[in-house]
Amino acid sequence: MQRSLDSLAGMATSAFGAGTSAAMRQATSPKTILQHIINFFTCGGIRRRNETQYQELIETMAETLKSSMSDRGAPLPENIILDDVDGCRVEFNLPGENNEAGQVIVRVSKGDNSETREIPLASFEKICRALLFRCEFSLPQDSVILTAQGGMNLKGAVLTGANLTAENLCDADLSGADLEGAILFMADCDGANFKGANLSGASLGDSNLTNACLEDSIMCGATLDRANLTGANLQHTSLLGCSMVECNCSGANMDHANVSGSTLIRADMSGATLKGATIMAAIMEGAVLTRANLQKASFTATNLDGADLSEANLRNTSFKDCTLTDLRTEDATMSTSTQTLFNVFYSENI
């Protein structure tokens, strides 16, 4: 029995003190030599049983929090009790009048026997909020609650049309998620992973996407006005028809992205890489592309009036039927054909 209590206490500590994939694997792996032997001859039976218990513990916690709190932003109860978890009582005592330790005290008991652990309050609260987030948006609970960086694990989540205004999604894993039409206005997505996600028609105005990964994502018709995409990864991203007015893409990797039909008026793309990017019928008036790498990028019928391409890499860059009035190209590196095109344009407009 004692080993059972110890195992459950360890699971509770891992799930609600860390919540990561590594913590889940450590908590559900066989511990003793006998368990390893049984696990081997049952083709992972011990691990599967532990994983089932781990998942049930998380689901019980989520339901308990949901029923005891008025909304996701409400203060957590000082005492959270999970009754009958595999015949045991699991209690979480938060810092307060009855707990001056500053940590969350976890107590697993059955009859006269008990096991006690401590977990950091900040981690516990973050994990509880993540569980409540899933409840609010009707997402099934996952045994991996947080990423290794401490963001929410929302991999493959269906959040179409969800209102995520000003949501904290820092370091969240939203790879493969469906966020079509979602509202992420002023959301903090610093370091978030949106690889392969569907963000078509999403509202991302004034959002923070610094160092976010948007590789291979679909963002057709999305609004990114004044969004901060500094250092973001937008390789092979479909940005067709996006509104990116005054968007900050400085230092972003936009190699092979398709920006056709987008509005990038006064966008800051300084130091960005757009190698092999497709830019057709885009509006880029006043865009800043200083020191940008535009090697082999293709500009067709694009308005570059007043854009700044000084010090940019324009080797083998194609400009066809583009508006180039007041374009700045000081110290830009370009192939002979591109230089000839600019010389002809400037001579015709003297």
UniProtKB/Swiss-Prot annotation:
Pfam families: Pentapeptide, PipB2_N. Residues 162-201, 202-241, 247-286, 287-326 form the Pentapeptide repeat domain. Keywords: Host membrane, Membrane, Repeat, Secreted, Virulence. It is found in: Secreted; Host membrane. Its main location: secreted. GO terms for cellular component: extracellular region; host cell membrane; membrane. Interacts with the host kinesin light chain (KLC), a subunit of the kinesin-1 motor complex. NCBIfam families: PRK15196.1. Contains various tandem pentapeptide repeats in the C-terminal region. The pentapeptide motif is required to efficiently recruit kinesin-1. No position is completely conserved in these repeats, whose consensus sequence is A-[DN]-[FLM]-X-X. The C-terminal 38 amino acid residues are required for peripheral localization of PipB2 and redistribution of lysosomal-associated membrane protein (LAMP). The N-terminal 225 amino acid residues are sufficient for type III translocation and association with Sifs and SCVs, but not accumulation in peripheral vesicles. Effector proteins function to alter host cell physiology and promote bacterial survival in host tissues. Involved in the reorganization of late endosome/lysosome (LE/Lys) compartments in mammalian cells. Necessary and sufficient to link kinesin-1 onto the Salmonella-containing vacuole (SCV) membrane. Required for centrifugal extension of lysosomal glycoprotein-rich membrane tubules, known as Salmonella-induced filaments (Sifs), away from the SCV and toward the cell periphery. Required for virulence, but not for intracellular survival and replication in phagocytic cells. This is Secreted effector protein PipB2. It comes from Salmonella typhi.
